[in-house]
């Protein structure tokens, strides 16, 4: 019986509920009558049709008038229940168009349904629009199998091999590998600019625009600073009105080495308070163990900044979370700083503090997935990485105040401790100086380095050594695993030869291959 177009929607919504009734495969129409009469829910579009049938009459699926107007009859949409799958656990509310089992409904068995319909029936089934084919547009090979399954011969297992399926009137389907590039392109098009940049590391092997030596540079350029920010981390912020002494105690209590400085008057971050500031205060105001360091006890951070910076005031060096890691590495090395705060330019919030160690560890995690440049197999002597001339060092009996003077004058972050025979026995870094604040022993800086190192934390990094004949790949792996900031280059006699730092390694891995671009940036 022809129905209005409005009934087409209503019948489609309830077709899955009707077809799941138990019925024999040889009598499709009888199975629908076994449910008993069910009045249709009222709808504005089906109102003109309702007077033609009584509310208690069953809904006939295959009336004889079906042949008179096949394009207008929505009852052929109930064929989805006749072609039953092998599973009997399908829910009445399940939608074959979206479930994986719906793909097999029309490719299972036309013989088991027991239909004796006219030759035009299969054509009409393929034209029905109950199931939106748009949901399969990401899998074209399965879509073709879905369309021609109703007019294909009985199931021969070809649905599991889309590439072998052939239609008498259509060419064979393409192999699934044919669609792999289109899927990757569709994925890249669907992602935003930030996420699309993350996919660049997967295409390193196909890039021919640059040499293989620039693979790490391209990796850092394709990742943003936000990618390296951990899910959970601690960030301590100091107001410039806080006393210097309390600020350093807070660094020790929270186990951090630096903190951004917030100035309430400007409502912005104006600088960083690091262990270097603590060393500079001790170096500048320490007189003797008998004289208290008044400036450390009473000065506020803003007072110290005014006295120390004076005419050398510089704005805070920071970076946006949307900037590339290549820009972060370049900013760290160019400005000769060890900590780079990541500040959101919109909200003004500080998100994280980038360091050489964090960046190199991030890069090392993905090194195994990237092509290995040739220079990774070269040793330190061939590459010339590190400092091998005029190495600053101290002895075990060197006073702390002298070590602090070397830190300030040479602008270095660590001093190897060498015994009388020339062997490296320990290392005294800037981070060890903060223990003076923890122990409240900064009033007596005449004690020896050995005495000061006795109070060192149990998490001491230790002296990690290497030699000049080790390749760069080994050096990177060792410094990342040891979680240290530098390696002492020693010879066979365990005597100091040089120092290789994190900045030296990042320079060799990232900036040296990108030297031409960095020089252009410097000139600008």
From Swiss-Prot:
Q: Which UniProt keywords apply?
A: ATP-binding, CBS domain, Fatty acid biosynthesis, Fatty acid metabolism, Glycoprotein, Lipid biosynthesis, Lipid metabolism, Nucleotide-binding, Phosphoprotein, Repeat
Quote the record's binding site residues for ATP 2: 257, 339, 357, 429-432, 456, 485-486
Q: Which residues carry this modification: Phosphothreonine?
A: 121
* PROSITE patterns in the cross-refs: CBS (PS51371)
Binding-site positions, AMP 2: 257, 357, 429-432, 456, 485-486
On modification after translation, the UniProt record reads: Phosphorylated by ULK1; leading to negatively regulate AMPK activity and suggesting the existence of a regulatory feedback loop between ULK1 and AMPK. Glycosylated; O-GlcNAcylated by OGT, promoting the AMP-activated protein kinase (AMPK) activity.
Cellular component GO terms, alphabetical: cytosol; nucleotide-activated protein kinase complex; nucleus
Q: An example of a Gene Ontology BP annotation on this entry?
A: fatty acid biosynthetic process
Pfam (any one): CBS
Q: Where is this region: Disordered?
A: 1-178
Gene3D superfamilies noted in UniProt: CBS-domain
Q: Where does AMP 3 bind?
A: 338, 387, 392, 413-414, 485, 501-504
In which residue ranges is the amino acid composition biased (Polar residues)? Answer: 148-168
Query: What segments bear the compositional bias annotation Low complexity?
Result: 112-123
Query: Compositional bias (Basic and acidic residues) at which positions?
Result: 135-145
Q: Does the keyword Signal feature in the UniProt annotation?
A: no
What's the stated role of this polypeptide? AMP/ATP-binding subunit of AMP-activated protein kinase (AMPK), an energy sensor protein kinase that plays a key role in regulating cellular energy metabolism. In response to reduction of intracellular ATP levels, AMPK activates energy-producing pathways and inhibits energy-consuming processes: inhibits protein, carbohydrate and lipid biosynthesis, as well as cell growth and proliferation. AMPK acts via direct phosphorylation of metabolic enzymes, and by longer-term effects via phosphorylation of transcription regulators.
| UniProt free text on domains | The AMPK pseudosubstrate motif resembles the sequence around sites phosphorylated on target proteins of AMPK, except the presence of a non-phosphorylatable residue in place of Ser. In the absence of AMP this pseudosubstrate sequence may bind to the active site groove on the alpha subunit (PRKAA1 or PRKAA2), preventing phosphorylation by the upstream activating kinase STK11/LKB1.
Name of the molecule in the record: 5'-AMP-activated protein kinase subunit gamma-2
Name the species this protein comes from.
Pongo abelii (Sumatran orangutan)
């Amino acid at each position: 019986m022809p129905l209005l177009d409005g009934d087409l929607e209503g019948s489609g919504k309830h077709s899955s509920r009707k077809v799941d009734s138990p019925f024999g495969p040889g009598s499709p129409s009888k199975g629908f009558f076994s449910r008993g009469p069910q009045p249709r829910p009222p709808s504005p579009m089906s109102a003109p049709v309702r007077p033609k049938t009584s509310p208690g009459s069953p809904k006939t699926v295959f009336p004889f008038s079906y042949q008179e107007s096949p394009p207008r009859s929505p009852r052929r949409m109930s064929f989805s229940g006749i072609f039953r799958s092998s599973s009997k656990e399908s829910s009445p509310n399940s939608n074959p168009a979206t479930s994986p089992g719906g793909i097999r409904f029309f490719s299972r068995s036309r013989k088991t349904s027991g239909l004796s319909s006219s030759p035009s029936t299969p054509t009409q089934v393929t034209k029905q629009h109950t199931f939106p084919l748009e949901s399969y547009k990401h899998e074209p090979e399965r879509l073709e199998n879905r369309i021609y399954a109703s007019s294909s011969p009985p199931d021969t297992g070809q649905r599991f091999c889309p590439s072998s399926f052939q239609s008498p009137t259509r060419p064979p389907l393409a192999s699934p590998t044919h669609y792999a590039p289109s899927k990757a392109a569709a994925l890249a098009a669907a992602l935003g600019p930030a996420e699309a940049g993350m996919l660049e590391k997967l295409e390193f092997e196909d890039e021919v625009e640059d040499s293989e030596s620039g693979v790490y540079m391209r990796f850092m350029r394709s990742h943003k600073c936000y990618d390296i920010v951990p899910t959970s981390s601690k960030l301590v912020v100091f107001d410039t009105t806080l006393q210097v002494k309390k600020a350093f105690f807070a660094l020790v209590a929270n186990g951090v080495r630096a903190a951004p400085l917030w100035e309430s008057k400007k409502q912005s971050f104006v600088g960083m308070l690091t262990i270097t500031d603590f060393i500079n205060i001790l170096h500048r105001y320490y007189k003797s163990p008998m004289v208290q360091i008044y400036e450390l006890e009473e000065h506020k951070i803003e007072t110290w900044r005014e006295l120390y910076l004076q005419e050398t005031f510089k704005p805070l060096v920071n970076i946006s979370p949307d900037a590339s890691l290549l820009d972060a590495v370049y900013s760290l090395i160019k400005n000769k700083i060890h900590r780079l705060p990541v500040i959101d330019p919109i909200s003004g919030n500080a998100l994280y503090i980038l360091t050489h160690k964090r960046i190199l560890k991030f890069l090392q995690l993905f090194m195994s997935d990237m092509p290995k440049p040739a220079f990774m197999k070269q040793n330190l002597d061939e590459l010339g990485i590190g400092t091998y001339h005029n190495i600053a060092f101290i002895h075990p009996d060197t006073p702390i105040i002298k070590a602090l003077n070397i830190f300030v004058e040479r602008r270095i972050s660590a001093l190897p401790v060498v015994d009388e025979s020339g062997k490296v026995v320990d290392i005294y870094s800037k981070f060890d100086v903060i223990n003076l604040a923890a122990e409240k022993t900064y009033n007596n800086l005449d004690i020896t380095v050995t005495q000061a190192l006795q109070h060192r934390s149990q998490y001491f990094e230790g002296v990690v050594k290497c030699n000049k004949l080790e390749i760069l790949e080994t050096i990177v792996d060792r410094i990342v695993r040891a979680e240290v900031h530098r390696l002492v280059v020693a010879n066979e006699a365990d005597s100091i030869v040089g120092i290789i730092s994190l900045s030296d390694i990042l320079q060799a891995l990232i900036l040296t291959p990108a030297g031409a671009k960095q020089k252009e940036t410097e000139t600008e």
